[in-house]
Amino acid sequence: MKISPLNEKHVALNAKMADFGGWMMPIEYPGAGVLAEHAAVRERVGIFDVSHLGKASVKGPGALAFLNRCLTNDLTKISDGSAQYTLLCTPTGGVVDDLIAYRNGESDFFLVPNASNTTDVVAVLQSCAPDEITVTNLHMEYAVLAVQGPLAPKVLESLGINTDIDYMAFDHVTIAGADVILCRTGYTGELGYELLPLTKDAVAVWEALADAIKPLNGLVCGLGARDTLRTEMGYPLHGHELSLEISPVEASAGWAVGWKKDSFLGSDVLTAQKAGAAKRKSMALKSLDRG
């Protein structure tokens, strides 16, 4: 079982811990609980440790064209310093994983897949990569922290960080003396940011964030609230709304497919499904009342 570099912090807070994708991670914290943590993010701000998320790099001449042949979305549609939600499919249209691709340049990309699928994502890309492309698993090299909620900018601004970046854009900033990748992304449906410090700097950055949310009545939040927040927003989770048996078209995630690209892994099957061959399609339901 893997543990977060912040594991001792969670244990000290008496967090309820559980296996999440092969990682022992905090689900909720005493004195608050999932509902209170959920409300804090919707109304104020919350911070999350999501260091279980995967990290990988794809580098080399032609990395842009290579990834565009593998991933569903069109990376030519974003510029350097931007990120994109995308999927890696099998030749039969199933989803190996959904992930965020950070574009540093045409020959340099950073990927953030899901925890339990990182090894599979790296293996698929390595098996497809030409000699000049290097795909590296960096899962243990970085932590991932999230600051989510309408007051998220105030948290970072109190630490001297410029928060005026576009949605899905990223920058390199300094927090607690550490170099951090700051991206205007999240998994809650609220205004927010995700931060990637090196593992060795995770505790210092976390402590700075934890101190900064106190004047705003923010909360430290677990993965239980993250799941209810993403469900309320309608975001898919691999293994549930997306899987090797559920395609992007069937999961109503066709918006993350670059339909005008020449081809990519699974493109023939997905194109046929889009044209009407899909036998099923997930739909969201909104509860109007309790019950």
Please annotate each region the language model reported.
Residues R42-E43, L71, L88-T90, V205-W206, ...:
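Short, intrinsically disordered/low-complexity patches at protein termini
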